[in-house]
Amino acid sequence: MKRLLLLGGIGEALALARRLGPAHLYSLAGLGKVPGDLACRVRVGGYGGAEGLAAFIDEQGFDLLVDATHPYAARISQNAVRAARLAGVPCWALRRPGWQAGPGDDWREVADWRELIAALAPFRRPLFTLGREPLEHLGQVPPHQHWTGRCLQGQPAAPRAEVIGARGPFSLDGERALFERLACDVLVSKNSGSQATEPKLQVAREMGLPVLVLARPALPPADREFADGEALLAAIRDWESA
């Protein structure tokens, strides 16, 4: 029986895992809730880099590695491609396209945190929706700014900064209420992409707020790449039956 290792981290990965049988393994880094209703096995934790992942693939006898991690998890994707090559198995990847700005959107892409800090200079109350990443930069908050960040787990208050613990998905009304309560004047976001644009981007459009978009990292090419989960699942079904 063929066996695959699915590296998860986004909603589409969980949707795939729900449709996998007990021969397969769904792997999570450890952030967030672990689903308890899956037919496939679940593993939580890292592997110690590409070499460790390759050894795990070889020891467990997996025939296929599927990378369905977040588009900004560049290191994991790099390790996945390298590990598959070391283990001698194919690596398939879910590479969902990014969101596209539409009428009324004011999106401004920045390449890295240096550009982001510079682009934030005219604003006073930015809202960061970058996960835990802003926590590493709280020492850079200028005197005229107050930062609010949102991630899975809240953090103790810092000078001129607040970190809210919240788990999505978020409703449109909830995002409107949050933006109004915070009186934010700019949104900082990743271009994560998905089938639907997130409510926070719609609220920014409604309120006429600019969105500073942290550019996607370059990802290594996989043996096969898929733009959506359904196409990936269809390929897995074909692979299982071949």
Task: Give, region by region, the residue ranges found by the protein language model.
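Glycine/small-residue-rich loop that forms an oxyanion/phosphate-binding "nest" at active or ligand-binding sites
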Residues: 54-113
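Internal active-site segments that recognize and position negatively charged phosphoryl groups
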Residues: 114-146
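Histidine/lysine/aspartate-rich catalytic loop segments that bind and position anionic ligands
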Residues: 139-169
